[in-house]
């Protein structure tokens, strides 16, 4: 089944070459940022963000990064990861590409 992961606003940092996502604040788990929470998960034997991202790449997921989100957050010049095939787009592109009988999950 085809899957597209759509990254917008600060989530765009997850696809940046410099792992800036690790510094993003989190609202759960008692951690101050994404990196601290991810490290805690790793110590508990839970798959890390990098492991899950690599699994999505291996399974052929599409990664779409929101052009408006990049501009709105001043990230349009941010170098992107070279281990993830990222395609630019927007919400309209994402919705247009969505299957009529598929599902959209927002987390």
Regions found by a protein language model. Name each.
Residues 3-9, 64-67:
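Short internal beta-strands
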Residues 23-26, 82-86, 105-106:
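Short, low-complexity, polar/charged sequence segments that are solvent-exposed and flexible
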Residues 23-58:
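A glycine-rich helix N-cap at a beta->alpha junction
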Residues 14-25:
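Glycine-rich loop at the start of a catalytic domain that most often binds anionic cofactors/ligands
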Residues 45, 49-96:
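A charged, amphipathic interaction segment
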Residues 1-3, 58-61, 99-102:
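Short coil/turn connectors at secondary-structure junctions
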Residues 12-15, 71-73:
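Short, active-site-adjacent cap segments at secondary-structure transitions
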Residues 40, 47, 93-107:
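Flexible, low-complexity linker and terminal segments
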């Amino acid at each position: 089944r085809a899957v597209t992961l759509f990254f917008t606003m600060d989530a765009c940092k997850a696809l940046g070459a410099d792992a800036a996502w690790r510094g993003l604040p989190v609202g759960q788990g008692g951690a101050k940022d994404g990196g601290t929470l991810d490290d805690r998960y790793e110590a508990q034997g839970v798959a890390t963000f990098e492991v899950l991202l690599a699994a999505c790449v291996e399974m052929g997921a599409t990664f779409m990064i929101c052009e408006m989100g990049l501009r709105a957050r001043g990230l349009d010049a941010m170098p992107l990861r070279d281990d993830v095939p990222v395609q630019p787009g927007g919400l309209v592109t994402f919705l247009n590409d969505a299957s009529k009988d598929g599902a959209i999950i927002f987390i």
